[in-house]
């Protein structure tokens, strides 16, 4: 059996970093972890190939080679995956589809040969069994949740690692919280399901053995969902593993704001090699936090929480949302002030959207306020419902926020605000490779010579040269800022 696994292309988005990746000669940020795991579940005697369209062109002869084409997609990849499915139909190659898009919208993909929905550890073996018997069903679904103790190590040999900025692994699925706009719990539930410590170490070892010596992203939606297991087992084991191998990786992940409450956990994460964490802050407006059931953020000094995490040794990236029913016209200036004051450099500010299956979606449907389908990109100036403040006021205010915080002067000043408060871990020493030196020189040209606000760039660089431990990060963030500006400029012009 010949299986071709295809990861559809991703459009130019906030998290694609396409403009920034050119500075370090990379094609994509992350490899398709889901497909690499699916490949590991398939029978060993089957011949498998993987084409990641974010790094490699998909040719018709690749599709003709395969007996089956396995595709996955998030909502944001919908346009690309639809084109792949149509190409397969014309060529006559059967398609097996799974992943978040197809699990959320199976009724819109009845034309696909086989739908293997929910978590692959449960439904894929059933499809394989029936396929080997010659009687595969149209749809495979389940209401159960997978036991991650059975999840295999991804087949890294199917990709070329050098094309990616970082590798990724998964430790857990699920989130204990219940934000009404989030579909994570719809897909994975509230109970935190974890891999064993030995599994995580084995995955790290597999990357290490293949020569990877760079950043690794823990893709968990909330890495700190089970703090006790982290502090007692996983993090101490990673610390020992990293020390024995002279700290080959740095880590980043996603977590909730209550990380700031736990000094011990932050200390262990930094000792293990974590230097960055993404947190859903959403809004400084307490009424809006209550509206969306973001209970873990209510009643806090959110700026102080961010600065606590920064001082512990981790950069805080954060998501923010505009368009809540409780938002007033003052929210735009308040959000700008919050982002600048907190030193959240990578601030993903998006418009509220209601994904299918969420409590927000169901409420808006009841109120007859849904409009178009969500695009999966909440920074593209689209919104799939009628906002209470009016769409024109919301879009005008949104444009003001992103154009202000990503102007070169405000952005570079925010980098300085962060770096002045940041205390990197003692093992978090930047690695200067040829691509890093080349990226620095490119940044001088694009930002320091032909850039829109050269003075603020040079202010950042000269400050960092006096504090060389920050130079690598300062240059990296400056380059990322160029990407962020290009994203919002392209959307606003459109």
Where are these regions (language model features)?
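Radical SAM enzyme core and accessory elements
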Residues: 2-5, 12, 47, 62, ...
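Phosphate/oxyanion-binding loops and surfaces in catalytic or ligand/nucleic-acid-binding neighborhoods
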Residues: 45, 91, 127-134, 151-154, ...
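Conserved beta-strand positions
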Residues: 5, 71, 218-220, 279, ...
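Flexible glycine/acidic-rich beta-alpha junction loops that bind and position SAM and/or redox cofactors
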Residues: 10-17, 104-107, 220, 226-228, ...
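A C-terminal junction/extension of Radical SAM enzymes
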Residues: 51-55, 145-151, 315, 327-350, ...
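Structural recognition of alpha->loop->beta junctions
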Residues: 107-126, 268-276, 336-349
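Radical SAM [4Fe-4S] cluster-binding motif and immediate context
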Residues: 150-317, 324-337, 365, 373
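Acidic, low-complexity intrinsically disordered segments
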Residues: 1-212
